[in-house]
């Protein structure tokens, strides 16, 4: 039996999908632009703080 592929980590989540990492690449900026144009409430993933 193989283990599940999704092993949640807040650090990895932010580093790969966070705002600053998106803005570092042209394609990431395109993602932000698309989501702004579409009127998304959340542009990138946010980690809820307890």
Swiss-Prot record:
Keywords, ordered alphabetically: Ribonucleoprotein, Ribosomal protein
PROSITE patterns assigned to the protein according to its UniProt record, in alphabetical order: RIBOSOMAL_L34
GO CC entries: ribonucleoprotein complex; ribosome
Listed GO MF terms: structural constituent of ribosome
Basic residues compositional bias, start-end: 10-20
Cross-referenced Pfam families: Ribosomal_L34
PANTHER family in the record: LARGE RIBOSOMAL SUBUNIT PROTEIN BL34M, MITOCHONDRIAL RIBOSOMAL PROTEIN 34 FAMILY MEMBER
Protein species of origin: Syntrophotalea carbinolica (strain DSM 2380 / NBRC 103641 / GraBd1) (Pelobacter carbinolicus)
Origin: domain of life: Bacteria
Family, per entry: Belongs to the bacterial ribosomal protein bL34 family.
GO BP annotation list: translation
The protein's name: Large ribosomal subunit protein bL34
InterPro entries: Ribosomal_bL34, Ribosomal_bL34_CS
Lineage of origin: Bacteria, Pseudomonadati, Thermodesulfobacteriota, Desulfuromonadia, Desulfuromonadales
Gene3D superfamilies assigned to the protein according to its UniProt record, in alphabetical order: 1.10.287.3980
Signal peptide as annotated in the record: none
Region (Disordered): 1-32
């Amino acid at each position: 039996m193989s283990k599940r592929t999704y092993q949640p980590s807040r650090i990895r989540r932010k580093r790969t999908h966070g705002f600053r990492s998106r803005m570092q690449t042209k394609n990431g900026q395109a993602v932000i632009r698309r989501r702004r144009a579409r009127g998304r409430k959340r542009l990138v993933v946010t980690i809820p703080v307890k």
